[in-house]
């Protein structure tokens, strides 16, 4: 399942008692990897660095910011809470041209910046990710799985 807004999490958790259920806001492996890298980077730099997210998609995309950007923001806030840091993580969303999707997480400190970025150039990556996850999930016991489980991180 790739429901961006977590609307049906409770139903999915109930189903996971009987079958293997997978949830991710984005089925791109690269987009999920930058999320995991951002969480790690937040635990190391979050205390001293400002954190911002950029979200670029085609001009016809309806949601602003995207579900992926909101999910990354939420995960970064969770990582900040773990290191007991309270700060705002801004999202700057742009809808322009025909971009399939581009997300950057920018950690800005004194005299340096760390930028974690993912650019999708084809919508095929979402289908390819879903197919790979489905093949993996097929072998799993009942439970509620996410991209961290799939990527083994």
Segments predicted by a language model, with ranges:
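Rossmann-like NAD(P)H-binding beta-loop-alpha module
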Residues: 32-48, 64
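Hydrophobic alpha-helical segments
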Residues: 13, 27, 38, 124-127, ...
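Conserved catalytic-site region of short-chain dehydrogenase/reductase
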Residues: 6-7, 31-32
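Short, small-residue-biased leader/transition segments that mark boundaries at the very start
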Residues: 1-5
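C-terminal substrate-binding/catalytic lobe of Rossmann-fold NAD(P)-dependent oxidoreductases
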Residues: 47-153
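Short, surface-exposed loop/turn motifs that are enriched in glycine and acidic residues
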Residues: 23-31, 58-65
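Rossmann-fold dehydrogenase core element
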Residues: 11-28, 46-51
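Short, hinge-like loop/turn segments at secondary-structure boundaries
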Residues: 13-19, 38-41, 69-72
